């Protein structure tokens, strides 16, 4: 018996072989025709109509209650769980009890996939079940699932360790059904947005992920190299510039759900790889986009949750249009954080940050204003459009100057519960102004701003051919999903969030164990028990370790000569 496997893994591999010895393929190639799901049966079964007299379901065994010649097990498919009643005389009609007594009772385990043919009924206790007339092994699980127990509405031994949940999301989805609902809602969010955009006649497009120049945002990019072309390329940080080129090309409205990548920090609301939706519509401005965004989010909230009234971090938030609107100056006055000077918002904005908040790397007034604004607005309880009156060049290099004040930009951001959700402009379409702003970004970069935008001359050339008045909006899908599903971390709305590599302790060589007196044949046994370094033996109580060794030897029928208690004490003692 291979001791590198756990006892359960060994037994399951033995069952795997036994199934094949009986002529049952544990991983059949043929399709299995499913006619109903657990949810469909639960929602549509009618005791008087007997509408599920011939049903085929398939899924994973999640629990079993074996009771002699009849048993129950719980089957889980992608929609939920349903109880299955199985009886020996039903599945073994020719008198050979092997299929029930051996295959079902001994060779199948929790986690295995099976197909069930039978009919729906209610047990004497009223529980909706499927009476199995025939079952098929569809896939054998050779690694046991975590055992999560429920009783009287309480969960015991829950699978909650975030580290394991995020690394093994497939396992998280199996044992925590509520996790799947988060991702079902995420898909609903995106589907509803697509329906909304398509109903307006806008076109979904795809633009390059590998780009020669990373543009459309102020961020640090990931860099890679294309061997065939022998050039460096960047993973995109935004879809903006390519989408605007399509507006130049004659599209009236385009949108893209795109993966963006930013080589920056990670926290509860940021992941280096994230999904963003950007949309650009010709002949519109940022005021139109405000109303458009309100309508979209109201529709999405209703589609996903059936209401526009939500609770986020204990605060009531409404996605019912219209949202509250403030200028940046009004938002700051409301928080009473700084003293304002001048009747117009521009003067107050230009003097926003306190001296100690200035960015000494490149003296970037706009960047410091933005950081301070985030601090000022953090903790707000209502969705609010913010017309950010920010310095033109540093803060909004792709945004049109405000029609009433050339020191400001036509831009808004939507904050929900103190966090930015979306960003929108009246898009800059003056090619000369755009080039000047790119050049200013270059000067900032030379002063040390590693997030300043690159100069994209192809984009400037596109603008020179003429781009109509246009409004654009970008919204983070991950963050929107967090809000609409009540999750506090972005990792909970990503199937496979970015994480550090698993830490793996390197096992000591056999020689390290034999040097302290451990017989060579006992080394793999000790390491299998979890003590993969000599140092780990120092922390053990010799008496208990001795009993564990002898018990492991006997249980697994290894036939090894047991060490004496004194020998074990020597292994566990500090060596000279």
Regions found by a protein language model. Give the residues of each.
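Class II aminoacyl-tRNA synthetase catalytic cores and aaRS-like
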Residues: 1-505
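Compact, charge-rich alpha-helical regulatory domains located at protein termini
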Residues: 502-576
């Amino acid at each position: 018996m291979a001791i590198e496997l756990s006892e359960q893994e060994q037994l399951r591999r033995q069952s795997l072989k036994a199934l094949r010895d009986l002529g049952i393929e544990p991983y059949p190639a043929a399709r299995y025709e499913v006619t109903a799901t657990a949810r469909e049966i639960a929602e549509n079964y009618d005791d008087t109509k007997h509408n599920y007299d011939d049903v085929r379901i398939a899924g994973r065994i999640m629990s079993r209650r074996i009771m002699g010649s009849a048993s129950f097990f719980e089957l889980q498919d992608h929609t939920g769980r349903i109880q299955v009643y199985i009886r020996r005389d039903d599945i073994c009609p020719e008198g050979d009890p092997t299929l029930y007594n051996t295959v079902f009772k001994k060779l199948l385990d929790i986690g295995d996939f099976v197909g069930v043919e039978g009919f729906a009924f209610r047990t004497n206790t009223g529980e909706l079940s499927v009476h199995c007339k025939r079952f098929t092994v569809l896939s054998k699980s050779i690694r046991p699932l975590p055992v999560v127990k429920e009783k009287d509405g309480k969960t015991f031994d829950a699978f909650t360790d975030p580290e394991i949940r995020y690394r093994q999301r497939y396992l998280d989805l199996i044992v925590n059904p509520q996790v799947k609902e988060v991702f079902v809602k995420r898909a609903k969010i995106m589907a509803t947005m697509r329906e909304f955009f398509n109903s307006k006649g806008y076109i979904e497009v795809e633009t390059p992920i590998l780009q020669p120049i990373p543009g459309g945002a102020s961020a640090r990019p990931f860099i890679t190299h294309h061997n065939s072309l022998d050039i460096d390329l960047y993973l995109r940080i935004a879809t903006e510039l390519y989408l605007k080129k399509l507006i130049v090309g004659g599209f009236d409205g385009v949108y893209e759900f795109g993966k963006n990548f930013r080589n920056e920090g990670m926290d509860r609301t940021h992941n280096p790889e994230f999904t963003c939706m950007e949309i650009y519509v010709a002949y519109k401005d940022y005021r139109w986009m405000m109303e458009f965004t309100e309508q979209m989010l109201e529709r999405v909230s209703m589609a996903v949750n059936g209401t526009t009234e939500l609770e986020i971090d204990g605060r009531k938030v409404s996605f019912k249009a219209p949202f509250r609107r403030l200028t940046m100056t009004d938002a700051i006055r409301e928080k009473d954080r700084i003293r304002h000077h001048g009747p117009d918002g521009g003067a107050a904005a230009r003097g926003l940050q306190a001296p100690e908040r200035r960015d000494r790397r490149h003296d970037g007034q706009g960047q410091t204003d933005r950081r301070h604004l985030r601090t000022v607005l953090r903790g707000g309880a209502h969705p609010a459009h913010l017309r950010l009156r920010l310095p033109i060049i540093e803060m909004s290099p792709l945004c049109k100057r405000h029609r009433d004040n050339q020191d400001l930009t036509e831009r808004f951001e939507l904050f929900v519960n103190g966090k930015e959700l979306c960003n929108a402009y009246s898009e800059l379409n003056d090619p000369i102004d755009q080039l000047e702003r790119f050049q200013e970004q270059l000067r900032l970069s030379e002063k040390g701003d590693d997030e300043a935008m690159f100069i994209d001359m192809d984009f400037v050339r596109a603008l020179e051919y003429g781009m109509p008045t246009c409004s654009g909006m970008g919204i983070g899908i991950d963050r929107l999903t967090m809000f609409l599903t009540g999750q506090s971390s972005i990792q909970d709305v990503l199937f496979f969030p970015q994480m550090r590599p698993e830490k793996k302790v390197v096992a000591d060589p056999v020689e390290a164990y034999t040097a302290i007196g451990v017989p060579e044949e006992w080394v793999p046994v000790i390491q299998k028990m979890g003590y993969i370094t000599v140092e780990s033996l120092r922390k053990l109580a010799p008496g208990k370790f001795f009993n564990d060794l002898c018990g492991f030897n006997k249980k697994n029928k290894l036939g090894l000569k047991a060490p004496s208690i004194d020998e074990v004490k020597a292994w566990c003692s500090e060596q000279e």
